C-alpha cells in the first residue's frame, strides 16, 4: 500500500505542482501539504481525475497551534471508493486569513465548514451560509482554540422561576486547583497517629 500511495502522491504532484508543498506517508496514510489559495482547484482535480476519483469528502477539521504565525492547520479527509484509497490535505493558515470554501465541489462541505468556523473561528469565503452550527447564536469565542477558557465565558441554564433559559457570567464556587501528580505524598507509607493496624 505505501508504494501505491507514493505513486498517487507523485501523480498529484506532477499534475498539480503549484498546489502541493510536499507530501508524506505515515501509518499507511498519505498527507499532502497544500498551498491555501489552491485548495478548490486541487479538490476539483482529486475528484475528477481518473487516477484519483476522490468523490467522498469524509471530514474537515482544524488543529490550533497558537505558537506558530500560521496558527491553524485546516485538514480535509477524502475517500476514493473506486481506488480504495484515502487522502488527507493539510494547509496552514494565519488567524486573519480566510479559506476558500469547497462547497461548490463537495456540497457536503457545508456543515463541515460551519463546524470549523464555529469551533475555531476560521472564515470560509464563498460559503452559502457560514453561521454557527454547534454553539448558541450569542456564543462568545471559539471553544476548540487552545486559548479558550475551559469554563467558557457564560453559563447557560434553565431557570425554574422564570421558566426560560438564562445566560449568566460564570461563577466558580471553588477556584481551580492545580494537582501535583508527582507529589512525594503519593504512594508513601506514612503511619498516622492512632493507626494501630499499620504498625502490625
Curated annotation (Swiss-Prot):
Cited Pfam families: Complex1_30kDa
Sequence similarity: Belongs to the complex I 30 kDa subunit family.
EC nos: 7.1.1.-
GO molecular function annotations of the record: NADH dehydrogenase (ubiquinone) activity; NADH:ubiquinone reductase (non-electrogenic) activity; quinone binding
Location of this chain's protein in the cell: Cell inner membrane
NCBIfam families for this protein: NuoC_fam (TIGR01961), PRK06074.1-5 (NF004733)
Keywords: Cell inner membrane, Cell membrane, Membrane, NAD, Quinone, Translocase, Transport, Ubiquinone
Chief site of localization: membrane
SUPFAM superfamilies the record matches: Nqo5-like
Protein name, UniProt field: NADH-quinone oxidoreductase subunit C
Provenance organism: Cereibacter sphaeroides (strain KD131 / KCTC 12085) (Rhodobacter sphaeroides)
Entry GO CC: plasma membrane
Encoding gene per record: nuoC
Catalytic activity: a quinone + NADH + 5 H(+)(in) = a quinol + NAD(+) + 4 H(+)(out)
Amino acid at each position: 500500500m505505501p508504494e501505491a500511495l507514493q505513486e498517487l502522491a507523485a501523480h498529484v504532484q506532477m499534475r498539480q505542482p503549484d498546489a502541493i508543498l510536499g507530501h508524506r506517508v505515515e501509518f499507511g496514510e498519505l498527507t499532502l501539504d497544500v498551498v491555501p489559495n489552491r485548495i478548490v482547484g486541487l479538490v476539483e482535480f482529486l475528484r475528477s481525475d481518473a487516477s484519483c476519483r476522490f468523490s467522498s469528502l469524509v471530514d474537515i477539521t482544524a488543529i490550533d497551534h497558537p505558537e506558530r504565525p500560521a496558527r491553524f492547520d485546516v485538514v480535509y479527509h477524502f475517500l476514493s471508493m473506486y481506488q480504495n484509497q484515502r487522502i488527507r490535505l493539510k494547509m496552514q493558515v494565519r488567524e486573519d486569513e480566510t479559506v476558500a470554501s469547497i462547497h461548490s465541489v463537495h456540497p457536503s462541505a457545508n456543515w463541515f465548514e460551519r463546524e470549523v468556523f464555529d469551533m475555531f473561528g476560521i472564515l470560509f469565503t464563498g460559503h452559502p451560509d457560514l453561521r454557527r452550527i454547534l454553539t448558541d447564536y450569542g456564543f462568545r469565542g471559539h471553544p476548540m482554540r487552545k486559548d479558550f477558557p475551559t469554563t467558557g465565558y457564560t453559563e447557560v441554564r434553565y431557570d425554574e422561576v422564570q421558566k426560560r433559559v438564562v445566560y449568566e457570567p460564570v461563577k466558580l464556587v471553588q477556584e481551580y486547583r492545580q494537582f501535583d501528580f508527582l507529589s512525594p505524598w503519593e504512594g508513601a507509607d506514612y503511619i498516622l497517629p492512632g493507626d494501630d493496624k499499620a504498625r502490625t
